[in-house]
Every structure is written in structure tokens, then in C-alpha cells.
Amino acid sequence: LPEVVHCTPAMTEEVLDEVQPDKLVLAHMGGWQMWQDVLDRLCGRDVYLDTAFSYGHIQYRDGAVHKWKLMDSDMFKAIVEKHGADRVLFGTDSPWSDQSEAISDIEGLKLPEGVRKKIMGENAARLLRI
């Protein structure tokens, strides 16, 4: 399994300036609650961003709805546009949140069909060679 590391977009940027990993997936769109830093520092870099716990709302499996400061639709679309839809992967915060809600949140953005397909599975299939 891959190593899990928590860091800021600025820390990731420093690493990327030193090394060029073959494949790197950054959870939570590259920096949870640091969306502007992601836009400024990481978009366009040779990394993947996943959508887990980043956009929409979180409803835990026990039914409780928690209001977290997740990014709004304008910021999500700005990151996807600047970074490129080819490098964004759909993700959920499962098992802590409801997967169907995460799907509904992304579907609700009304992204162009090609962009939606890439994010919702085509990119992951290409990355994993399946």
C-alpha cells in the first residue's frame, strides 16, 4: 500500500521542485481547506488530485450531517480547469461518509460530459492500467 503523508500544498510544492515522482495522488484535492494554495501552487503540476472530502457536503453513514468548510463549486471548477480534468480522480471519504452523496455532489456540478467521465472513472482506469 502507498505511504500516507499529511502536508500542505507548499510542502508538496517543495518536494515536487526536488523530485519528479512517476505517479503521485494527492488526497483531498491536494490540501484540505487550503484550496487557494492548491490553485496557486499545485495546479498544472504532474500530480493527480482526488475529490475525497473536498466538495459538497458530508453525511456520515450514521445519518449525521456535519457542516465542514468544503470548497464551493466555483473553486472546484477553477481547480479542475487550471489543473486539467485528466489529472482529477473521483474519491469519497468512505467508510466515514456516504458514497452515493459524493457521487451526487459531483454529478450536481453539471460538468461537461467528457470532464465528468474522466473524473468519475476514466482517469483512475488509465492510472491503474485497467
Residue ranges with predicted function:
Residues 20-30, 48-59:
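Active-site core of metal-dependent hydrolases
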Residues 7-11, 34-44, 59-73, 96-108:
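Histidine/acidic-residue-rich catalytic or RNA/ligand-binding cores of hydrolases
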Residues 17, 22, 48, 105-112:
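Short, electropositive alpha-helical surface patch
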Residues 27-29, 50-52, 83-100:
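Short acidic/histidine-rich active-site segments
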Residues 31-32, 54-56, 95, 126:
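Residue-level marker for beta-strand->alpha-helix junctions and adjacent short loops that shape enzyme
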Residues 78, 82-87, 98-130:
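Mid-to-C-terminal alpha-helical segments outside catalytic/metal-binding sites
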Residues 14-19, 38-46, 77-84:
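Acidic (Asp/Glu)-rich catalytic clusters
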Residues 1-40:
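Divalent metal-binding pocket/active-site signature
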